[in-house]
Amino acid sequence: ISYIGSYEGMEKGMIMETKTPYYGIATGKLRRYFDLKNFTDPFRIIKGYFEARSRLKKIHPDVVFSKGGFVAVPVVRAAHALKIPVIIHESDMTPGLANKLCIPVASKVCCNFPETLKYLPSDKAVLSGSPIRSQLFEGDRSRGLHFCGLTSDKPVILIMGGSLGAVAVNEAVRAVLPELLKDFQVIHLCGKGKTDKSLNNVTGYVQYEFIKEELRDLLAAADLIISRAGANAICEILALRKPNILIPLPAAASRGDQILNAESFQKQGFSYLLPEEEITNEKFLDTIHQVYSDRENYQKQMASSQQNQAIPIIADLIDQLASV
């Protein structure tokens, strides 16, 4: 395996830690709005295309796999020009601009959601779900409880507001916390700078800005998850078969993709969708108790999903195209 990315992308250090060969190329962002860089970035993209051709000739891969993003466009286009098969993975419900530019030259296009299939050429589309890092399946419940100082006497709710936290979700949790702690324990990932010091010593409640290494253990400890509805996060929840309540970013604060993601998961019986603007103390508590009571049905639906098999599906596609 070799990896092509931007010269100084945040992924560079992570990839190099795995001893995977990393090749940088020039990149330019694809914007839908006015920016002075719109005048210079096309030249960077063209430069990136020729650098990608050079890197691919050196690597000589059997297949190129792309997760999208502006870095991928010159690489995918260069691979097509060199007659190297390309597999694309689209994480969101609707293809982003970069993938829209890559789909015409791709051999196969994998996706997370059944609703995405209508946007893709039928002879290329594959419903795979999202590849999930294997470390997430190595979590240990008892280790997670010990890390948080919790017990096994009450079920555990894990609340995740995304990497930056979610003010509305944090406020909703704190407003009902005394009632919530009568029946549950709570692990609250609040986001950077968003913890509440007045709650530091509340029994049965722990809060962190974010968690990295121990997250797999916290996920294993959770009986119910409350989360935003980013594609990667909810696919991890699905893979772990955790009953969940999704509170997507409102349309006013996003392009609406999280709402579509949550609607799809609710339609398939994987999740309960709770719009942020509909949250009241009473509804929040009722929803938590309802989903927890119905947890076995949610787990049953998630267990039957074909979106849980992304890694073997994608590996099989790579094998097929590599042998062509």
Regions found by a protein language model. Name each.
Residues 20, 84-85, 223-224, 241-249, ...:
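Structural loop-to-beta junction motif characteristic of Rossmann-like glycosyltransferase folds
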Residues 307-324:
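C-terminal alpha-helical cap of glycosyltransferases
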Residues 51-64, 71-87, 100-105:
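Glycosyltransferases and closely related glycan-assembly transferases
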Residues 10, 21, 80-142:
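Active-site-proximal region of nucleotide-activated glycan assembly enzymes
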Residues 1-44, 49, 53, 128, ...:
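Conserved nucleotide-sugar phosphate-binding/catalytic loop shared by glycosyltransferases and other
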